[in-house]
Design a protein with these regions (language model features):
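Intrinsically disordered, metal-sensing/regulatory segments
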Residues: 1-258
Length: 258
């Protein structure tokens, strides 16, 4: 039950954020979107460092001077994995007019949902690999540290849910469909978490690689999507401030609960 709830918490954060479409009448302003993107980026960077990369290196201590290698290799595999998905799947980032990936007849709404879904894949993997480490008895990963990551992802998923549902509403979708789009974008997280747990249980020695793989995938999303989004326009400083806030919140959660 503990693991089930931990996997579900980030998804609930997305759903709660998507529900904002029922209570807010206007679309999110540029200032708000940049603030939310900065906060999400800060949480993801802190989670990648404190919850994923450092435990990956600690678990490889027996390799001596090569203890960095699993984290190094897994990190690059994660980056390349997201780069490949980015090129293979048609998607449209919020606020952009030009779709990325192969040409497609998909609607703008569908491609916007796909963009956020791509973003959520590494987050689900990160939660899954943390709980896999806990279930395997890894001394570097406790139930509390896994919960800290789950809560941190849920916190940054709340604004993400709003970031997808509100623009969908602005695109002309009714509130119900806009909410559903936000919820569906987060559904990949518990699925990814469960698949990652199953994979890790089969190959426990690969846990350091899986931890750093999730970190690489998350940081790819931060650099490719969130940093440009939070830095646009004359309000760019607000994105930086909220990045620092998100980083601080996730760091505090990891240290306090881990």
């Amino acid at each position: 039950m503990e693991v089930f709830l931990g996997i579900l918490i980030p998804f609930l954060g997305t759903a709660a954020g998507a529900a904002c479409v029922f209570f807010m009448k206007s679309s999110l302003g540029d200032l708000v979107q940049r603030s939310l993107a900065g906060f999400a980026a800060g949480v993801m960077v802190a989670a990648s460092i404190w919850s994923l990369l450092i435990p990956a290196i600690e678990q490889s201590a027996a390799l001596g001077k090569l203890s960095f290698f699993p984290a190094f290799a897994g990190f690059w595999l994660g980056v390349l994995f997201l780069l490949t998905l980015d090129r293979m799947i048609p998607h449209l980032h919020i606020g952009s007019e030009q779709a990325e990936g192969p040409k497609s007849d998909l609607s703008r709404t569908a491609m916007m949902v796909l963009a956020v879904t791509l973003h959520n894949i590494p987050e689900g993997m990160a939660v899954g690999v943390m709980y896999a480490g806990f279930l395997s008895g890894s001394p570097q990963i406790t139930a509390a540290s896994a919960l800290a990551l789950s809560l941190g992802i849920a916190i940054q998923n709340f604004p993400e849910g709003a970031i997808i549902s509100m623009p969908l509403r602005a695109e002309g979708e009714n509130r119900g469909r806009a909410f559903l789009g936000g919820v569906l974008s987060g559904a990949v997280e518990p699925i990814g978490a469960v698949l990652t747990i199953l994979a890790a249980q089969l190959i426990i020695p690969a846990l350091p690689y899986l931890l750093s793989f999730a970190a690489g995938a998350m940081l790819y999303v931060v650099v490719e999507e969130l940093i440009p989004e939070m830095s646009q326009g004359r309000h760019s400083n607000i994105g930086t401030v909220f990045f620092a806030a998100g980083f601080s919140v996730m760091m505090a959660l990891d240290v306090a609960l881990g």
